[in-house]
Amino acid sequence: MPERNVKVGSSVGLHARPATIFTQAASKLPVKVTIAKANGGNAVDARSVLFVLGLDVRGGDEVVLAAEGDGADAALDELEALLQRDLDKE
């Protein structure tokens, strides 16, 4: 299963708006994606806004994205690019 470490670009982290944008993007992908804090936290379903909010990811934190299935690398590319942006300013 491919993984990516990504530094979160949103200045205040994955609060309601950025988490919603992220989970909506993950929900549209044809593969299963998980997200976890890079410090060894539990991986959660990237399609669930409640699970993503529960990670308490702050701006500048590093997360680990993992995807399973055909197209996993492309899915990770898309979500990595999304998380690196400051979604609070969009």
Go through each PLM region and give its residues:
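Generic alpha-helical hydrophobic packing signal
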Residues: 3, 21, 25, 74-75, ...
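Intrinsic-disorder/low-complexity, polar/charged segments enriched in Ser/Thr/Lys/Arg/Asp/Glu/Gln
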Residues: 1-5, 62-64
